[in-house]
Amino acid sequence: MKRMNGLELVENLNKVSEEIEAIFNSYKGEELSYVDSIIMDRLETEAHIIKKALEDNGLYGAFLDYIKALEDIQVISDKIEFGVAKFRPAFYTAMELAEDRYRKAKGYLMSKEVLVDL
């Protein structure tokens, strides 16, 4: 058992997801090797354990808010960077709101301690 806060869980879930994606992308539709299939099983089990820990501890909603806020910030940043949002105050207000949602979700995730069997 390992004690982690909710944000550490989210970071671990993101890391596991990236590893799974990298393995899938390396095979491009071919069958996984025996070793990679074992690694994939371990990663999928770890992702399931983390997701279950988030759900069981009431953190899954905050996790979704955190991810959505990050996506919104990225989309708005891209629009501002490429001039789509130039001179449109609504984009800057939307950015402030997304950053506020991000801070709240991150703070909530950081404030909750969880025991996880990883």
Residue positions per predicted region:
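Short terminal alpha-helical segments
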Residues: 1-44
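Small side chains
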Residues: 6, 47, 51-53, 77, ...
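Non-transmembrane amphipathic alpha-helical segments
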Residues: 16-23, 50, 69, 76
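Charged, low-complexity interaction regions
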Residues: 24-37, 59-60, 79-91
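Short, charged, amphipathic alpha-helical segments
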Residues: 33-45, 63-67, 88-97
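Short, solvent-exposed, charged loop/turn and helix-capping segments
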Residues: 46-65
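Amphipathic alpha-helical binding modules
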Residues: 70-118
